[in-house]
């Protein structure tokens, strides 16, 4: 008999409530409810509409409970963003969006207090202005911060509203850059030196922790009272759990708005070389470390689509991939991680401005711009995997691409060509699968991440891509891309048109 679990998977563009059925050998997924997840710009900055997110989640849970006996609920989302609660447990304000510009200059401010090397040695986390650490530094002295008693990351905030429990799940907590990687607890020393109160942070719990049943009033509202689990609540952590790899020598790309590119490690790697390469050591399932690099991902193309739609031209991702496939190859390139591409805006114009500023002929039209973005992403992936191999001393035998980007056959093929490694694409729904299977693990239905990966591999089809194309051309393109990244590092790119 199949057990049913609900995975709530929150992404930067949309959220979903997914019903997972697991019979002990195979699993299946059914999307119960989907809703847009849009940021809201207020006078004080860019925010998430977290109350609407909660209401949409409740609607999805109620729908599922009418159809099935649900044995568990788990929440996953992106990292770093958080809500603040006052002493009565009330939300102080809608959470800020990590793309809000208030963190500009906060890295330098932090390094003026605690040297960069010490922060990395303590936390092992990549330096990004979006990290919770820098968001908190930017909030010091604000009325919101002054009345805050508890900080909860987005999945933990939802869990609190469902169960009343205030905890921070470990895989997501590590993204804050405030966790001591040796003790797996909040670094009280780092917090004290930065002038941030350790009392703000809730206790850390490992994935597969049962938080308890729904609050009585929530259970009455939804017509069910399933237990809630702290799963691997960082969406990439859930996705990596569900990578259907049969051997340990795989690299992964969790491909969506962000692309997270890396390997699974038993120990964190905090060498100077890892810090200078801006690799991160995020928490994984069963005590593993996700040694990876954050790459801007499909965000650039998402923003291009929004701009083109505003201009009256609607393109699906599938249409853009078809157009890009027929566009000339080995053309202009961009560094997807350049600061010019972080904030929302006219991204097509920024791509053109970047190319022009770097002495390249700017791409004209959606086909050429999409080709530029796809080739640049593939080269960035190849670069990150080459770095991961060098930093870990391990050889990678294949690349597993999971998430929405695994549907993009062109990007997968370009990744195989650029890296010279075979690519296995899928499953698309790896995050929801990992969420469901960690709940099954908590219930004792599976015993390890290896068993979970075998279940996923037996339950869902994947696609294979072998390296092809002109190897010499790709080698030259890789060298040109590497030079471009080095030269663009200190270059300011104007917004353009």
Predicted feature descriptions by range:
Residues 38-41, 123-132, 174-178, 199-207, ...:
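A glycine-/small-polar-enriched, mobile loop at the entrance of the PLP active site in fold-type I
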Residues 11-13, 69-71, 76-78, 132, ...:
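Short, basic and Ser/Thr-rich N-terminal targeting/leader segments
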Residues 76-80, 207-208, 255-258, 398-406:
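Glycine-rich beta-strand-to-loop/alpha-helix junction loops that act as flexible
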Residues 1-93, 121, 203, 219-228, ...:
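N-terminal glycine/serine-rich phosphate-binding loop of ATP-dependent small-molecule kinases
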Residues 164-173:
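Enzymes and membrane/adaptor proteins characterized by extended Gly/Ser/Thr/Asp/Glu-rich
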Residues 100:
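Carbohydrate-associated surface elements
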Residues 69-77, 150, 203, 391-403:
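Short glycine-rich phosphate-binding loop at a beta-alpha junction
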Residues 6-7, 19, 111-123, 129, ...:
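Active-site core segments that coordinate phosphate-bearing ligands/cofactors
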């Amino acid at each position: 008999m199949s057990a049913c679990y609900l995975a709530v998977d929150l992404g930067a563009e949309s959220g979903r409530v997914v019903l997972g059925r697991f019979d002990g050998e195979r699993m299946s997924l059914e999307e119960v409810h989907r809703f847009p997840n849009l940021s809201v710009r207020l006078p004080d900055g860019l925010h998430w509409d977290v109350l609407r997110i909660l209401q949409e989640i409740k609607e999805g849970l109620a729908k599922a409970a009418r159809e099935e006996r649900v044995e568990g609920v788990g929440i996953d989302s992106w990292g770093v963003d958080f809500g603040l609660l006052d002493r009565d447990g009330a939300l102080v304000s809608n959470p800020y969006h990590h793309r809000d510009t208030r963190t500009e200059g906060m890295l330098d401010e932090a390094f003026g207090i605690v040297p960069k090397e010490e922060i990395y040695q303590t936390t092992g986390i990549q330096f990004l202005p979006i990290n919770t650490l820098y968001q908190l530094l930017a909030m010091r002295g604000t009325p919101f911060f002054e009345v805050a008693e508890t900080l909860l990351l987005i999945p933990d905030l939802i869990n609190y509203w469902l169960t009343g429990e205030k905890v921070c799940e470990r895989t997501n907590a590590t993204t804050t850059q405030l966790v001591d990687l040796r003790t797996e607890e909040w670094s009280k020393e780092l917090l004290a030196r930065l002038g941030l109160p350790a009392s703000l942070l809730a206790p850390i719990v490992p994935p597969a922790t049962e938080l308890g049943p729904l609050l009585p009033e929530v259970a009455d509202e939804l017509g069910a009272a399933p237990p809630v689990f702290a799963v691997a609540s960082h969406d990439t952590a859930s996705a990596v759990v569900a990578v259907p790899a049969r051997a340990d020598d795989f690299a992964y790309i969790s491909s969506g708005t962000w692309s997270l590119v890396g390997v699974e490690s038993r120990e964190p790697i905090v060498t100077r070389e890892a810090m200078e390469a801006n690799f991160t050591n995020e928490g994984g399932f069963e005590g593993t470390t996700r040694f990876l690099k954050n790459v801007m991902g499909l965000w650039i193309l998402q923003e291009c689509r929004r701009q083109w739609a505003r201009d009256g031209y609607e393109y699906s991702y599938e249409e853009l991939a078809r157009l890009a496939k027929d566009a000339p190859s080995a053309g202009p390139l961009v560094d997807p991680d350049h600061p010019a591409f972080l904030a929302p805006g006219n991204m097509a114009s920024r791509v053109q401005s970047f190319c022009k500023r770097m002495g390249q002929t700017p791409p004209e039209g959606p086909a050429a711009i999409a080709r530029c973005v796809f080739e640049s992403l593939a080269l960035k992936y190849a670069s990150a995997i080459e770095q991961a191999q060098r930093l870990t001393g391990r050889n990678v035998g294949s690349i597993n691409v999971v998430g929405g980007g695994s549907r993009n056959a062109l990007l997968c093929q370009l990744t195989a060509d650029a890296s010279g490694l075979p690519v296995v694409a899928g499953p698309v729904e790896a995050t929801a699968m990992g969420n469901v299977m960690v709940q099954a693990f908590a219930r004792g239905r599976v015993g390890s991440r290896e068993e979970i990966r075998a279940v996923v591999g037996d339950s869902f089809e994947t696609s294979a891509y072998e390296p092809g194309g002109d190897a010499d051309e790709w080698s030259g393109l890789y060298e040109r891309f590497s030079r471009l990244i080095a030269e663009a590092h200190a270059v300011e790119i104007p917004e353009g048109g």
